[in-house]
């Protein structure tokens, strides 16, 4: 039963109440559950229990979690066979699937694989012990929780150490390279780095294996993004493999996201060619370069990008997809703390657009009075 509104009566007679970090202690349902002596469990604890019953793949990182986990779920849903078919997934947004079908962000499948976003914002991903951990990047974020960049990256080092089979990391992020070099030798030895850079450019990989991404085009004006994965021998077979991939979602960042999803699918046991073919029909995650429509030659794109790096990647993708068009942005900052921490970086990222309108800040869990130096 779905109840609308937060009311104490909603938890009457319940044995267990599950909450997320977005729910405050003074929430009427949490207060009522405490008073009734009901068991109160954080969402991450439930997700950790579900992972223990499946072959779990987590996707963590400041950017790209939803798209990467959506791509992997899409691959498994459309190309999974046997135990890889009908996966479970817990994703922070709906998926624009094959033939325009919209899949909910959560599904309890009968297969033995679970794909889940691993939220680092509050440190709760420390509870997870997946088979495979994907780390898209570890650029500083959520400093309201971690305090320093070093603390933030240390959390990713810890998370990588919990993966029992493999770690898959993007090597185009300097934060990830710092995390990689801080890994225990055993963990680094089962780590796969995917990157648009070659080994000489990346430097010390601490014993990790490199899968290189080679972009095939300067623009995605045709509506497609083409790239090739160079997979070394010994990773998914004795021979070196060159896998051509075509995406319908633009942007080099999406080539990176798709690379992680394809590698994860291959490590789970899917043929890598089958995985790369399946990702071609992926149309996007909700509010990730989602084209809402075109009126009078004006195309409206909706995107949840709320960190400077995400905004820069979004605008680069827009330039690749629409190289002859003017790019006009309406941007609503998310969180007073993030706006304060990254004000200069936001300005630099938004400068990639031709015109920018900045609206009021969306506070989410924060209160403006706690940030008197930030204009709402």
Identify the meaning behind each predicted range:
Residues 1, 76-79, 370-376:
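Short, intrinsically disordered, charge-balanced linker/junction segments flanking boundaries
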Residues 3-6, 41-48, 90-93, 186-221, ...:
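Beta-strand->loop->alpha-helix junctions that form or flank phosphate-binding loops
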Residues 10-13, 21-190, 259, 266, ...:
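Phosphate-binding loop of NTP-binding sites
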Residues 98-99, 141-146, 337-338, 362-369:
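A short acidic, helix-capping loop that chelates divalent metal ions and anchors anionic groups
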Residues 166-172, 328-331, 352-363:
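Short internal beta-strands
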Residues 212, 218-241:
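Acidic-glycine-rich active-site phosphate/pyrophosphate-binding loop
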Residues 235-355:
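Nucleotide phosphate-binding/pyrophosphate-handling subdomain across enzymes
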Residues 346-376:
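C-terminal helical cap/extension that packs against the catalytic core
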């Amino acid at each position: 039963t779905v109840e609308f509104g937060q009311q104490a009566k909603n938890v009457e007679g319940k044995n267990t109440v599950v909450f997320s970090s977005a729910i405050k202690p003074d929430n009427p349902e949490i207060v009522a559950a405490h008073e009734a002596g009901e068991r109160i469990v954080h969402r991450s604890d439930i997700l950790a229990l579900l992972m223990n019953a499946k072959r779990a793949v987590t996707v963590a990182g400041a950017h790209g979690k939803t798209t990467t986990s959506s791509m992997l779920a899409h691959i498994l849903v459309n190309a999974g066979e046997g135990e890889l078919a009908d996966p479970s997934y817990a994703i922070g947004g709906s998926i624009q699937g094959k033939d325009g079908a919209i899949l909910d962000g959560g599904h309890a499948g009968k297969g033995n694989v679970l794909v889940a976003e691993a939220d680092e914002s509050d440190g709760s991903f420390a509870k997870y012990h997946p088979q495979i951990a994907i780390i898209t990047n570890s650029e500083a974020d959520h400093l309201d929780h971690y305090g320093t960049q070093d603390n933030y990256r240390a959390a990713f080092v810890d998370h990588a150490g919990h993966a029992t089979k493999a770690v898959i990391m993007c090597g185009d992020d300097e934060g990830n390279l710092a995390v990689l070099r801080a890994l225990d030798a055993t963990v680094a030895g089962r780590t796969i780095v995917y990157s648009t850079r070659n080994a000489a450019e990346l430097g010390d990989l601490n014993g990790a294996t490199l899968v290189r991404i080679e972009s095939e085009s300067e623009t995605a004006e045709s509506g497609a993004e083409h790239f090739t994965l160079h997979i070394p021998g010994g990773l998914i077979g004795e021979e070196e493999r060159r896998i051509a991939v075509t995406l319908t979602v633009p942007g080099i960042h999406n080539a990176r996201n798709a690379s992680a999803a394809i590698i994860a699918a291959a490590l789970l046991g899917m043929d890598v060619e089958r995985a790369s073919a399946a990702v071609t029909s992926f149309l996007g995650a909700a509010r990730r370069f989602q084209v809402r429509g075109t009126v009078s030659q004006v195309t409206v794109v909706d995107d949840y990008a709320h960190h400077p790096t995400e905004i820069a990647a979004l605008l680069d993708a827009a330039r690749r997809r629409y190289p002859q068009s003017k790019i006009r942005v309406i941007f609503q900052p998310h969180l007073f703390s993030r706006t304060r921490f990254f004000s200069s970086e936001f300005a630099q990222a938004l400068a990639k657009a031709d015109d920018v309108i900045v609206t009021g800040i969306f506070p989410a869990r924060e209160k403006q009075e706690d940030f008197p130096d930030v204009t709402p």
